[in-house]
C-alpha cells in the first residue's frame, strides 16, 4: 500500500435489508475528497481492483469498490463466467446504490461529486448505475456491455466516457455503433474511445495475454481527466 493512503473494508446498508461490504481507499490525512465507485471485473474483488482503487485514491479521490460476489474471488474464467451469470442484476445495483448513499452520508460536502468507473462486467454495471443514479457526475465504463433494454440510457444525466479495444470480440463494433446511436438518440453527453490494437481487458496489468500498456496509459489519463473536470470543480 502507498504510505500516503488509507485502506480498509467497510460495511454499509443495502436497500431492502441487509448489508454489503466494499474496499475503501482514501488519501491519508486529507480532508473531504470527491468519490469514485469502482466496479469489479467478473473475477471478483481481487488484488487488481484493489490496486486500481489505490491508484485512484492517489489522485485525491475516496474510492469504494463494492464486493458484488460477497467474498468470492477466482482466476478461473469458467467459474467467473458462472458467477457473473448467477449475479442478480437488481441485487448488484442495490449494492452499488448502497455504496453511493454510504459515501454521500460520510462525505456530505462532496455528496454531488461522485463518479463511477468499472471494468468488464463492472463496465456494464457502471453504465447501468449511471442510468439509475442521477447524482453521478461522471461514468467511465471500460469494455462493458450495453443496458438491456437500451432505452434505460435516456435517464443518464452525466458525461460518459466509454473505453474499449478494437480487437474485443465481446464489445464488438456492432455494440459500439449501437451505443453511439443511443448517445445521440437520448441526448447523452457521451464519448467513445476505441484502441484499435487492444483486446478485451487491455487495462488489466496482471494479465500479460491481453494487457496493452500504451492503450492502458492513454485510457487512464483520459479517465482521470474526466473525473477531475467533473468531480473536483
PLM features per residue range, with description:
Residues 1-2, 9-109, 202-204:
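Serine-hydrolase catalytic machinery in alpha/beta-hydrolase-like enzymes
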Residues 156, 162-164, 168:
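Short beta-strand/loop motif that positions the catalytic acidic residue
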Amino acid at each position: 500500500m502507498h504510505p500516503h493512503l488509507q485502506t480498509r473494508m467497510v460495511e454499509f446498508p443495502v436497500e431492502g435489508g441487509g448489508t454489503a461490504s466494499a474496499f475503501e481507499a482514501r488519501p491519508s490525512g486529507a480532508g473531504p475528497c470527491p468519490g469514485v465507485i469502482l466496479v469489479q471485473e467478473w473475477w471478483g474483488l481481487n488484488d487488481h481492483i484493489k490496486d486500481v482503487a489505490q491508484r485512484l485514491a492517489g489522485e485525491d479521490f475516496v474510492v469504494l469498490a463494492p464486493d458484488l460476489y460477497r467474498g468470492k474471488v477466482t482466476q478461473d474464467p469458467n467459474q467467473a463466467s458462472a458467477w457473473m451469470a448467477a449475479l442478480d442484476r437488481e441485487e448488484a445495483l442495490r449494492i452499488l446504490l448502497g455504496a453511493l448513499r454510504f459515501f454521500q452520508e460520510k462525505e456530505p460536502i462532496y455528496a454531488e461529486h461522485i463518479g463511477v468507473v468499472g471494468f468488464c462486467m463492472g463496465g456494464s454495471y457502471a453504465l447501468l448505475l449511471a442510468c439509475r443514479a442521477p447524482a453521478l457526475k461522471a461514468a467511465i465504463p471500460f469494455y462493458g456491455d450495453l443496458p438491456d433494454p437500451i432505452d434505460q440510457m435516456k435517464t443518464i444525466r452525466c458525461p460518459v466516457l466509454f473505453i474499449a479495444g478494437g480487437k474485443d470480440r465481446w464489445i464488438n463494433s456492432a455494440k459500439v455503433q449501437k451505443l453511439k446511436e443511443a448517445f445521440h438518440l437520448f441526448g447523452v453527453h457521451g464519448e467513445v474511445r476505441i484502441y484499435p490494437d487492444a483486446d478485451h481487458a487491455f487495462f488489466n496489468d496482471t494479465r500479460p495475454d491481453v494487457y496493452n500498456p500504451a492503450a492502458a496509459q492513454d485510457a487512464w489519463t483520459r479517465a482521470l481527466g474526466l473525473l477531475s473536470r467533473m468531480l473536483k470543480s
